[in-house]
Amino acid sequence: MKNKQSNTTEKGMAYDRMLCTGLNDAAKQIHEDAKRKGFWDSERETGTLLMLCVSELSEAVEADRKGRYADLKAYNECEKADDIFESDKEVYELSSFQSLIKDTFEDELADTVIRILDLCCARGTDLEKHINLKLKYNRSRERMHGKAY
């Protein structure tokens, strides 16, 4: 059944409000960090940046194929550890990240989003606005958007 465009979803919730907020602020911070690390010392082509996003998604696929998933429970326990000398804490946290989070499915998805947000800030794209517009439009479309998959 095709939804008629209105200000409510099938469940009656209003969707004319911003559903996606904070991404533009995150994009600014990510882009500033990337500039500080030298990733923007020279202008970068949009196509290259988009392919870097694709490569991160490919790494997420590979992590999934290998069954590599983040163990946040163990990582959070490591963060709570109070028997670590303050001078060793940074090394301990880095080691915990590398063994429990790095190169996992979730880590690669995070890398993908970071690259997308960096690109959006660099190109002046208001991603929050575009996501909200797309969500609103998609709610007006038929089931599965009229496609098999």
Task: State where each predicted segment sits.
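Flexible "arm" and connector segments at domain edges
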Residues: 1-149
